[in-house]
Amino acid sequence: MKILVTGCAGFIGFHLIKRLLDCNETIIGIDNLNNYYDINLKKARLDQLKLDQNFSFHQIDIADRLAMKKLFNSNQFDVVINLAAEAGVRYSVENPNAFIDANVVGFMNVLEGSRYEKVKHLIFASSSAVYGANTKDSATEYD
């Protein structure tokens, strides 16, 4: 399968891609390499992933509609996994434009690319904020 993973240099993206590469999947990873998290850590993760011939990286911001359209038009993805986001409720209040660009505009570009190119499966990460205020120490599948 050919799989697109957005946010590939992040913690979850990096570890997911390592597992997918262990299964001999073909992975195209994209990340904007912004400074929300340590850029050197992101680059070190990418250096490890690039050792596998089934991985290729493109520095693309998912909010860039034309770059995303070109990426989808030039690839036939079987699966798209969207892990690119600006995380954190506090950050969204302090930096609303960056939050909207990544989490709304960017995600819409992922959705539209997937729709127009007839991607079979789309997986996206949500937020722990969807659980609301929880008085317990942890959430269960029944909460």
Language-model features: where?
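N-terminal Rossmann-like NAD(P)+-binding domain of SDR-like oxidoreductases, especially those catalyzing
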Residues: M1-D143
